[in-house]
């Protein structure tokens, strides 16, 4: 138990220590200031901008920024879709893997361009090396960079005033890749290789075991994809077992690096925001609220798993476990990680829009599974995905400012900018589109016979598997309750739709809000006379409960039919 506390403390301290330097670095990159990696990144950026031509030089309005973002995503979607359909005739395919069916290729392409990485396939049997490297791994970089671009555009809109432009998407995209994601990923990949993660394009090995049977050992360019999988909060594993596989996550060191990587950029953006708007206290307040939400989620999930079998009263089981006083739930977990390493990793991955797992979420106790759902359902705002976590949290921040200001009889304002009705329309659109998407698609799936046939469990847990799939898709997480066999035409198409709506619907609202904020006057006098201090402890509490009430209550009735009912059924066994 003491070792668990030490690990947790070390993890939190590590995240806190890297937040300021990495946040400052991101600030310098996007403000065109000198950085230590200019010598490495600038040559790539020059070639990239030369190819783009004039489109990368002019500042863009919010509408132009969004149009460029969508245009790029459409091109990326077509690129990935074609490769997945034709991978059977493309090179670097020693296992002679055939092309995917159209519904599955559609789902996978949408999944990777939206930074969701939902996988209705098994990576080692359904995707060639060529497709892994040129389609999926590339999208791990660019989809994360797209989310980062949106966050940076939003931050600019708060810092700037009385102008119409929020930056240039193409320029921001290159900076995100060449200065941030690519250099850090290279370092992480090298560490992974030294830790035993394979990096090759060899054919799978056929070995004879001592029992006289043949075993196939997969190979592949795993280290390079694993690095960006975590750093870019993508989560899509090279193998079906994801980070529970010893090739993806062989040691406690790689496990720790993956967890830190998942939170690194999201945490750093809180400081980037504070530095950019000239109020670092504001950034640390966001960091603090995120951290408290994370700790609460981790504690509930861990306690639920440590005492996950206490409802069993069999004398034989009590005789075996009587010495420890409680029954921990080790089903679906790697014995080399144990309960706490598993719950810590999965709390991190479901809090961020990562979706990687080092244990089987479907085998968790109902309450622990519910916490994973809540982490996603509130909008992935507990640090969240690269960029997406920050702009999702900012929507709740705006709502808290609006509610708090009205409660004290003041005109709503944030950092000297007046918050008006149009701003709140975009804010609420961003906050409600994903929950609406989840509830509609879950309700439809619950009455579709083909979905029932895809379930391995019935009743409350079966409903939880359906609910989890659409929460994960709409909030761009990508993890799953594996009891749902997701490779059906209906699920491939509807989950793809939920991913598209959850990603680009929210991004559209965020960029439109940015376009509104950037045009406003910034009055320091307005900020000073307002009695709503947005860096105070009271305001932090207001933001905390706004997230819980607005984010949590929208999905609570569905949770009541799923994991809560599932837990009650266990308690009354």
From Swiss-Prot:
Q: Which UniProt keywords apply?
A: Cell inner membrane, Cell membrane, Ion transport, Membrane, Potassium, Potassium transport, Transmembrane, Transmembrane helix, Transport
Short name of any one Pfam family annotated for the protein? KdpA
Which topology term describes how it sits in the membrane? Multi-pass membrane protein
Q: What is this protein called?
A: Potassium-transporting ATPase potassium-binding subunit
Q: Which HAMAP family match?
A: KdpA
What organism is listed for this UniProt entry? Answer: Francisella tularensis subsp. novicida (strain U112)
Describe the subunit structure: The system is composed of three essential subunits: KdpA, KdpB and KdpC.
What family does this chain come from, according to its entry?
Answer: Belongs to the KdpA family.
């Amino acid at each position: 138990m003491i070792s668990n506390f030490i690990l947790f403390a070390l993890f939190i301290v590590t995240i806190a220590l890297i937040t300021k330097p990495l946040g400052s670095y991101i600030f310098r990159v996007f403000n065109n200031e000198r950085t230590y990696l200019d010598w490495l990144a600038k040559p790539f950026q020059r070639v990239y901008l030369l190819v783009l031509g004039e489109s990368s030089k002019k500042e863009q309005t919010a509408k132009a920024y969004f149009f460029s973002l969508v245009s790029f995503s459409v091109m990326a979607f077509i690129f990935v879709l074609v490769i997945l359909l034709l991978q059977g005739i493309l090179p670097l395919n020693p296992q002679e893997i055939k092309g995917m069916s159209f519904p599955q290729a559609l789902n996978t392409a949408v999944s990777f361009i939206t930074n969701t990485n939902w996988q209705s396939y098994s990576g080692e049997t359904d995707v060639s090396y060529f497709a892994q490297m040129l389609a999926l791994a590339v999208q791990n970089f660019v989809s994360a960079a797209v989310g980062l671009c949106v966050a940076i555009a939003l931050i600019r809109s708060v810092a700037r005033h009385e102008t119409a432009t929020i930056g240039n998407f193409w320029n921001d995209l290159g900076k995100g890749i060449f200065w941030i994601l690519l250099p850090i990923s290279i370092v992480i990949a090298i560490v992974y290789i030294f830790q035993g993660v394979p990096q090759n394009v060899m054919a799978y090995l056929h070995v004879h075991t001592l029992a006289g049977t043949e075993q196939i050992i997969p190979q592949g360019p795993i280290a390079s994809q694993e690095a960006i999988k975590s750093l870019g909060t993508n989560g899509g594993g090279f193998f079906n077992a994801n980070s529970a596989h010893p090739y993806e996550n062989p040691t406690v060191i790689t496990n720790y690096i993956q967890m830190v990587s998942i939170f690194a950029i999201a945490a750093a953006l809180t400081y980037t925001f504070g530095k950019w708007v000239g109020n670092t206290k504001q950034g640390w307040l966001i960091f603090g609220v995120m951290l408290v939400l994370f700790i609460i989620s981790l504690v509930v999930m861990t306690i639920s798993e440590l005492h996950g079998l206490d409802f069993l009263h069999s004398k034989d089981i009590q005789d075996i476990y009587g010495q420890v006083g409680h029954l921990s739930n080790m089903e679906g977990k790697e014995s080399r990680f144990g309960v706490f390493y598993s719950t810590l990793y999965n709390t991190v991955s479901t809090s961020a829009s990562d979706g990687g797992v080092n244990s089987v979420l479907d085998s968790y106790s109902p309450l622990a599974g519910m916490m994973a759902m809540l982490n996603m359902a509130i909008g992935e705002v507990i640090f969240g995905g690269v960029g997406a976590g920050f702009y999702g949290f900012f929507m709740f921040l705006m709502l808290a400012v609006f509610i708090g200001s009205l409660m004290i009889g003041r005109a709503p304002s944030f950092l000297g900018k007046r918050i008006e009705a149009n701003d709140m329309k975009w804010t609420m659109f961003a906050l409600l589109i994903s929950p609406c998407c989840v509830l509609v698609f879950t309700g439809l799936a619950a009455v579709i016979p083909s979905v029932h046939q895809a379930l391995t469990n019935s009743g409350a847990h079966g409903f939880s598997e359906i609910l989890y799939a659409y929460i994960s898709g709409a909030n761009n997480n990508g993890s799953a309750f594996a009891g749902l066999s997701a490779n059906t035409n209906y699920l491939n198409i509807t989950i793809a739709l939920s991913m598209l709506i959850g990603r680009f619907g929210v991004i559209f609202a965020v960029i439109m809000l940015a376009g509104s904020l950037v045009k406003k006057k910034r009055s320091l006098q307005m900020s000073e006379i307002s009695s709503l201090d947005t860096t105070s402890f009271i305001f932090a509490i207001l933001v905390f409960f706004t997230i819980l009430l607005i984010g949590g209550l929208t999905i609570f009735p569905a949770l009541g039919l799923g994991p809560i009912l599932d837990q009650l059924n266990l308690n009354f066994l």
